[in-house]
UniProtKB/Swiss-Prot annotation:
<comment type="function">
    <text>Involved in peptide bond synthesis. Stimulates efficient translation and peptide-bond synthesis on native or reconstituted 70S ribosomes in vitro. Probably functions indirectly by altering the affinity of the ribosome for aminoacyl-tRNA, thus increasing their reactivity as acceptors for peptidyl transferase.</text>
</comment>
<comment type="pathway">
    <text>Protein biosynthesis; polypeptide chain elongation.</text>
</comment>
<dbReference type="InterPro" id="IPR012340">
    <property type="entry name" value="NA-bd_OB-fold"/>
</dbReference>
<keyword id="KW-0648">Protein biosynthesis</keyword>
<dbReference type="Pfam" id="PF01132">
    <property type="entry name" value="EFP"/>
</dbReference>
<dbReference type="InterPro" id="IPR014722">
    <property type="entry name" value="Rib_uL2_dom2"/>
</dbReference>
<dbReference type="GO" id="GO:0003746">
    <property type="term" value="F:translation elongation factor activity"/>
</dbReference>
<dbReference type="InterPro" id="IPR013852">
    <property type="entry name" value="Transl_elong_P/YeiP_CS"/>
</dbReference>
<dbReference type="InterPro" id="IPR008991">
    <property type="entry name" value="Translation_prot_SH3-like_sf"/>
</dbReference>
<dbReference type="GO" id="GO:0043043">
    <property type="term" value="P:peptide biosynthetic process"/>
</dbReference>
<dbReference type="Pfam" id="PF09285">
    <property type="entry name" value="Elong-fact-P_C"/>
</dbReference>
<dbReference type="InterPro" id="IPR013185">
    <property type="entry name" value="Transl_elong_KOW-like"/>
</dbReference>
<dbReference type="InterPro" id="IPR020599">
    <property type="entry name" value="Transl_elong_fac_P/YeiP"/>
</dbReference>
<keyword id="KW-0963">Cytoplasm</keyword>
<dbReference type="InterPro" id="IPR011768">
    <property type="entry name" value="Transl_elongation_fac_P"/>
</dbReference>
<keyword id="KW-0251">Elongation factor</keyword>
<dbReference type="InterPro" id="IPR015365">
    <property type="entry name" value="Elong-fact-P_C"/>
</dbReference>
Amino acid sequence: MIEASKLKAGMTFEAEGKLIRVLEASHHKPGKGNTIMRMKLRDVRTGSTFDTTYRPDEKFEQAIIETVPAQYLYKMDDTAYFMNTDTYDQYEIPVANVEQELLYILENSDVKIQFYGSEVIGVTVPTTVELTVAETQPSIKGATVTGSGKPATLETGLVVNVPDFIEAGQKLIINTAEGTYVSRA
């Protein structure tokens, strides 16, 4: 059992028959009354997100999640296909459950598949990935003063803010936790 006050982003627990992943968690002390935990959560099975509050002393069953190395094969219709690189077993995951992760990976990319018992519940991508710029505004000479950057669409459809000197066709290193530009590859 784990108390609500100990739940952090990325942890998974069971509540009301649902498998829930914590997206954001914060302590909140109102002017009057007791401390509460405000949380943004995702139902792992359905993909739906919701906000809720818990008392810090509420207890939940922590879910034991196992991960295995895998490779992203392809996406067809509403299903993404992955292969365990140790056993060569293939797994089908609904795109709705891994939509965010698919923005960071290309076919044949290495990932980790998350299991709850024998049920596939998600995918973990590397902390940084290398992606190519598909489309961005052209650079304007002498526009170095602003330093605000410009939006760039990458080959997976992800849109990130990049420095003005980045052009289409260049390979970039992207931080997957924050969805931000790190450097040129």
